[in-house]
Design a protein with these regions (language model features):
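Terminal helix-turn-helix DNA-binding modules in bacterial transcription factors
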Residues: 8, 41-79, 101-102
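Hydrophobic, helix-rich cores of sensory/ligand-binding and other regulatory modules
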Residues: 1-2
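Short, flexible active-site loops
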Residues: 9, 21
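Basic/polar phosphate-binding segments, predominantly the helix-turn-helix DNA-binding elements
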Residues: 22-50, 74-98
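Short helix-capping/hinge SLiMs at alpha-helix to coil transitions
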Residues: 12-17
Length: 102
């Protein structure tokens, strides 16, 4: 198992609101605890922090291109726009709608 395969899987499924360490472990035929430990040892960050960073970076890029907040939320794996907006604001320190204005 190569971390690069896992990272590729994450990128390909970033839009999936069910993307989780459990799902990836199952798809890669690994135990949850082994994947969690190995991922952090290799990348230096936890699986959830890695996924959050990717989602927030992609969201910011999509918003900067003029995409609607509700569309972006869905494209980066969040069913609920309000939850996405709170996470985005906590992560970046600005509201998603403020990215559209800059």
């Amino acid at each position: 198992m190569a971390i690069s395969e896992i990272v590729k899987f994450i990128h390909e499924h970033l839009h999936d609101d069910e993307l989780s360490l459990y799902l990836v472990a199952e798809k890669m035929y690994l135990s949850y605890s082994y994947l969690s430990r190995t991922f952090k040892e290799t990348t230096g960050v936890s699986f959830s922090d890695f996924v959050l960073r990717l989602r927030m970076e992609r969201a910011k890029a999509l918003l900067a291109k003029g995409s609607k907040v509700y569309d972006v939320a869905e494209q980066v794996g969040y069913k609920h726009v309000n939850y996405f907006s709170k996470l985005f604001q906590k992560y970046w320190g600005i509201k998603p709608s403020d990215v559209l204005k800059t």
